[in-house]
């Protein structure tokens, strides 16, 4: 479709009207360029997909929404905007789209959150009830749902009242009532525990109400994990050919895709035996009480028992083999080099893939049959079986995917990382098996790039070391396929608005020197606090260990420090804003996650402290396997993995400072390697152009370090 004169006029009219809605709106050339590039791509005038880096201040959200909505209307398609996290998803849904609705009054939009963000009305009713019959019913359905105390019951009753009177839409983030994680776990549900259309509350269920709204919406705000799942199952979202897709925070996509495709399962032999026994009994109950018209051959008791016995023997053999690779009787981990399994293990995995897939098919057949039963049956008993069969289906589905992935030598042209872990829980040792591909470009090509005609991938940071090459390698986007890569200029004058400060540290921030380095950092930080030049400050660390050691050095300043983990992030930011507004000094302290999505302008943040260059951890199974693979290709892992990742992290950290034309301040980086190592210049060259200062550092007095037992990493 060409960009017609009428379409261009519509986009221009909305953009002009928007300027009247935003106080102090400043027209910016990069924003106009982004609107034009997005429009050309979505209309099919230029290229297949567009990766566009839009630095802070460009106004990227409105720059893709305006042309996206106009073209979606013209082509009668749905515009899907996907983000990496719930916070940005909610911001677009609650702030940006309502703003656009002022200039597009008939705009219809909705949000598609994951099932776990919504309350389950069935569970809420049980927890809000004082009637024991409700709780007895849930117990019969194998759901232990009782309030822990009267206060919790009253809280749930208030939530139910708000839901029933439409004061609350059922989203966890949209209520002011405090809901701790333990209570929310019981209030929400997952796919395996949902009765779907068989549930009494189906028509009023917030999750399904939201899903039905998608069919009527012009704009759907989703997240990357949900989009990946929807493309895999062809559910939730409209047909890919009828979509326009924008992937905001697109730099997260490869990691989200990899996480979505990672498979893990417990394979402890006694536990596995119990699951198989429960399933055979479940099938027997279905055959006895709700016999299907057509009997699946595998449901015949003798055949099912023999099938499960073979499956158990394979699992038991695998337990014995894997345990040989790990020290006996304790928590441990074993990774298979280059993802290459011994022949014996590979043969077991291949056979397990076939056997678990057959059980998955049997569970699905019974579940479909049970779901079609009429009201002439005992509905409570039927629902109990549906829930149990649904959970069995979820287990065998995950197992089938795990063993299929374990059977692959490569995925997306790279090895599949495979490892086993032994973990202690409540005094018992449990064995787990894990698989994940180190590259997901083929899967992204199949699910997204080839399926959806035109996609916009955008973020304030898409490049590392001034290059799109890392994004191209990890995502599979490529110029040869017609994909375009654009980096917009920043609208800010960084030279005038701020500076980078690299203190003259005596030591590098290596593990051996960590204590002295943090002591020096704390001394310089204390000097900055005492100067009283800055009201709002942010301190970013590469590890929780280093953050804790720093806090040990500044205990007398603890009252002004708002530390990640003390409270939910949004509450820390709220408190920070209030303090600065009252003229008080306030310091946010956190890890890399605080370097994303934190938008504090002016005095709210005028000094950022960065502990050190944040190279990625090198001890995870995925990173180690990727390193082995790169070396086998005569590629240097530091250049391919570590340095681009560090550059990316540093760009994001430094990007916290200048958020508007009125922002000012300093970025203090406590890492002399930026000036002494060859790669330091490359890292600095990828940052906005700030003047650099190198002040002296007061001597830090090293504290005696208490011996602490470092926690063992359980997962990658």
From Swiss-Prot:
Return the EC number: 5.6.2.3
- Map motif DEAH box onto the chain: 131-134, 248-251
Reply yes or no: does the keyword rRNA-binding apply: no
Positions annotated to bind ATP: 54-61
Question: What's an example GO BP annotation here?
Answer: DNA repair
The UniProt record gives the binding positions of [4Fe-4S] cluster as 120, 194, 199, 205
Q: Which PROSITE patterns match?
A: HELICASE_ATP_BIND_2, HELICASE_CTER
What catalytic reaction does the record list? Couples ATP hydrolysis with the unwinding of duplex DNA at the replication fork by translocating in the 5'-3' direction. This creates two antiparallel DNA single strands (ssDNA). The leading ssDNA polymer is the template for DNA polymerase III holoenzyme which synthesizes a continuous strand; ATP + H2O = ADP + phosphate + H(+)
Q: Summarize the protein's role.
A: DNA-dependent ATPase and 5'-3' DNA helicase. Unwinds D-loops, R-loops, forked DNA and G-quadruplex DNA.
Name of the protein in its database record: ATP-dependent DNA helicase DinG
Name the source organism: Escherichia coli O6:H1 (strain CFT073 / ATCC 700928 / UPEC)
């Amino acid at each position: 479709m060409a960009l017609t004169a009428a379409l261009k006029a519509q986009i221009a009219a909305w953009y002009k009207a928007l300027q009247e809605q935003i106080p102090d709106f400043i027209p910016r050339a990069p924003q106009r360029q982004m609107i034009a590039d997005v429009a050309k791509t979505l209309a099919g005038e230029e290229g297949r997909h567009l990766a566009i880096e839009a630095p802070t201040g460009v106004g990227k959200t409105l720059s893709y929404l305006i042309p996206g909505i106009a073209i979606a209307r013209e082509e009668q398609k749905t515009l899907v905007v996907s983000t990496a996290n719930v916070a940005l998803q909610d911001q677009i849904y609650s702030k940006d789209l309502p703003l656009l609705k002022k200039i597009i009054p008939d705009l219809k939009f909705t949000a598609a959150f994951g099932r776990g963000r919504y309350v389950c009305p069935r569970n809420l009713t049980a927890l809000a009830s004082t009637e024991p019959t409700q709780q007895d019913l849930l117990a019969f359905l194998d759901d232990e749902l009782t309030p822990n105390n009267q206060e919790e019951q009253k809280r749930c009753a208030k939530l139910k009242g708000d839901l029933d009177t439409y004061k609350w839409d059922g989203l966890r983030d949209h209520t002011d009532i405090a809901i701790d994680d333990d209570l929310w776990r019981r209030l929400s549900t997952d796919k395996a525990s949902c009765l779907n259309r068989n549930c009494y509350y189906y028509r009023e269920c917030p999750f399904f109400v939201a899903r039905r709204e998608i069919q009527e919406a012009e704009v759907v705000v989703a997240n990357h994990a949900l989009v990946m799942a929807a493309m895999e199952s062809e559910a939730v979202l409209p047909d890919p050919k009828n979509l326009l897709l924008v992937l905001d925070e697109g730099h997260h996509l490869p990691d989200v895709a990899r996480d979505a495709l990672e498979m893990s399962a417990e394979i402890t032999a006694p536990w596995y035996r119990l699951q198989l026994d429960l399933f055979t009994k479940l099938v027997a109950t279905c055959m006895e009480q709700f016999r299907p018209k057509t009997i699946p051959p595998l449901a015949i008791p003798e055949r099912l028992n023999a099938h499960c016995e073979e499956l158990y023997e394979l699992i038991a053999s695998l337990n014995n083999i894997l345990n040989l690779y790990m020290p006996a009787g304790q928590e441990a981990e074993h990774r298979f080099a280059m993802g290459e399994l011994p022949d014996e293990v590979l043969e077991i995995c291949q056979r397990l893939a076939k056997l678990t897939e057959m059980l998955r098919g049997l569970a699905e057949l019974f579940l479909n049959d049970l779901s079609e039963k009429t009201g002439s049956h005992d509905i409570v008993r039927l629902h109990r079986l549906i829930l149990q069969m649904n959970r069995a289906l979820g287990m065998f589905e995950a197992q089938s995917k795990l063993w299929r992935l374990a059977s692959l030598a490569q995925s997306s042209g790279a090895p599949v990382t495979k490892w086993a872990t032994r973990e202690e829980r409540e005094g018992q040792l449990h064995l787990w098996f894990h698989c994940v591909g180190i590259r997901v470009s083929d899967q992204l090509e199949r699910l997204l790039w080839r399926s959806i005609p035109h996609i916009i991938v955008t973020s304030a940071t898409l490049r590392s070391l001034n290059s799109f090459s890392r994004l191209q390698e990890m995502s599979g986007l490529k110029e040869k396929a017609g994909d375009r890569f654009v980096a917009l200029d920043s609208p800010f004058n960084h030279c005038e608005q701020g500076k980078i400060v690299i203190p003259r540290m005596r030591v590098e921030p290596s593990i051996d020197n960590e204590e002295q380095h943090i002591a020096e950092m704390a001394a310089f930080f204390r000097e900055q606090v005492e100067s009283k030049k800055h009201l709002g400050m942010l301190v970013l660390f590469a590890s929780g260990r280093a953050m804790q050691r720093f806090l040990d050095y500044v205990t007398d300043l603890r009252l002004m420090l708002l530390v990640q983990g003390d409270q939910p992030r949004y509450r820390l930011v709220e408190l920070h804003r209030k303090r600065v507004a009252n003229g008080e000094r306030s310091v946010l302290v956190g890890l890399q996650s605080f370097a994303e999505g934190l938008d504090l302008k002016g005095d709210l943040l005028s000094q950022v402290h960065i502990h050190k260059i944040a190279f990625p951890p090198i001890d995870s199974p995925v990173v180690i396997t990727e390193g082995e693979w790169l070396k086998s290709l005569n590629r240097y892992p530091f250049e391919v993995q570590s340095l681009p990742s560090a550059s990316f992290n540093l760009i994001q950290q430094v990007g916290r400072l200048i958020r508007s034309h009125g922002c000012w301040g300093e970025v203090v980086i406590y890492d002399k390697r930026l000036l002494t190592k060859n790669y330091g210049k490359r890292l600095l060259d990828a940052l906005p152009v700030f003047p650099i200062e190198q002040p002296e550092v007061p001597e830090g007095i090293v504290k005696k370090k208490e011996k602490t037992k470092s926690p063992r990493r359980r997962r990658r």
